[in-house]
Amino acid sequence: MKRAFILVLDSFGIGATADAKEFGDVGSDTLGHIADQCEKGLADNDKRQGALRLPNLSKLGLAMAHKESTGRFAPGLDADAEIIGAYGHAAELSSGKDTPSGHWEIAGVPVLFDWGYFTDKANSFPKELTDRILERAGLDGFLGNCHASGTQVLDDLGEEHMKTGQPIFYTSADSVFQIACHEETFGLDRLLELCQIAREELEDYNIGRVIARPFIGPGKGQFERTGNRRDLSVEPPSATVLQKLVEEKQGNVVSIGKIADIYANCGITKKVKATGIPALFEATLEQIKEAGDNTIVFTNFVDFDSAYGHRRDVAGYAAALEYFDGRINEVLELMGEDDVLILTADHGCDPTWPGTDHTREHIPVLVYGQKVPAGSLGRRETFADIGQTLASYFGTSPMDYGKNFL
């Protein structure tokens, strides 16, 4: 019975890529810099203290993959761990450092075109675009129209939004159009309808995602984003390995978290919603227990990125990594003789880096299975090696990009 479990630690980069200079990210290193801060005692909180401890991920090859990427061992990690899996680091072929590009490339379809972006920090959106959205939605105005941190924009504009009923439109360095609205005063269904209108109106702008950002709370300093986020993505430009598994092998792909949104539901046969790393982990375990032959269970752990990377919360990121490390053996215990586990990421988001944006980094490629030889996979030229490996494993037609590493 062939089953693959893909766990994406969203934003968990392990060192800058050779082309990082094109993105202003030379020297970025999500894992390494978190470990450095922990070693210095600068990442203590109520959930963790001291050096970064990831013994189980180190056994799967994380410390070695990071060393091959950067030339140094991350402090605190066990450099002498007995390696039980295959490990490597992969560079990104895609032109961006965003979530869809990273995930699509993981599934064998790199993004070789340039996304559209809203580059102006203020007055970010064309008036003709916002006018059409407002007219179709029956709204008299909107707030924002700028680059913004998703949490800061709530403090800045959340109360005005509640008073006026005008949605908050904002963007970032990514190819995104984000809409924040209060779940109770504006309404979740109304927000999702508004996002669908925006998705349709953005077709000519080549924007990767429209993101619904619902929040709750009575006022400034008390606003909190909810788990009802939705990502409305465009479809991948060609068939991913997920689609090939479903169409060619009548297989199944179980999306946990925002995976289905990222792939615009293409190649997804089941969607499981969960919010927060513990709930996402529990859902993953349940779906692994239920998974049959020719199945991919695919989970995105978004909080590493959204709650800690973008917010530049080193201590929070470190605590989340240690929590994840403490539970990963629960997955290993459920694995059958032919199963394959792949731990990876979609980009970096170094919480010590200036600004709040993603960073162009190598991603870890940690592979475990009873039939997977332990040892180095080296540097992979593209994330698409993961997709090509899955295509070979499941016996689908090959992908156009990537090399099988098993």
Swiss-Prot record:
Keywords (A to Z) from UniProt: Cytoplasm, Isomerase, Manganese, Metal-binding
Residues that hold Mn(2+) 2 according to the record: 305, 310, 358
Cofactor: Mn(2+)
The keyword Cytoplasm is annotated on this UniProt entry: yes
PANTHER family: PHOSPHOPENTOMUTASE (PTHR21110:SF0)
UniProt keyword Isomerase present: yes
Name assigned to this protein: Phosphopentomutase
GO molecular function: magnesium ion binding; manganese ion binding; phosphopentomutase activity
This protein's pathway: Carbohydrate degradation; 2-deoxy-D-ribose 1-phosphate degradation; D-glyceraldehyde 3-phosphate and acetaldehyde from 2-deoxy-alpha-D-ribose 1-phosphate: step 1/2
